[in-house]
Amino acid sequence: QPWLVHGFRGGPVQMAQLHSNGILVSLGLKADPLTIKQVPQERLFLETDGNTLISQVIELAATVRNESISTIQNLIIRNNRNLLSL
């Protein structure tokens, strides 16, 4: 069963340690930008809490990763489907 750490705010080294143990991380507006930039595409998960809109988190990820919003949206959809085996 896959594990997904909600609200991950650690750095790239911690993220890599979790990934090496099969644990995924979900990132929001308060995530470390370097972590957002370095998370592999197939392991990118985004989230929102409170008053934050998911579009804000997607825009942040797109900006930090220098990718289009549609690319990030498609990655998130694909990764969630893979995680949930849909």
Task: List each model region and its residues.
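Short acidic/histidine-rich active-site segments
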Residues: 42-53
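Catalytic pocket-lining loop regions of alpha/beta-barrel enzymes
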Residues: 1-43
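Divalent metal-coordination and catalytic microenvironments
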Residues: 18, 49, 72
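Mid-to-C-terminal alpha-helical segments outside catalytic/metal-binding sites
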Residues: 58-86
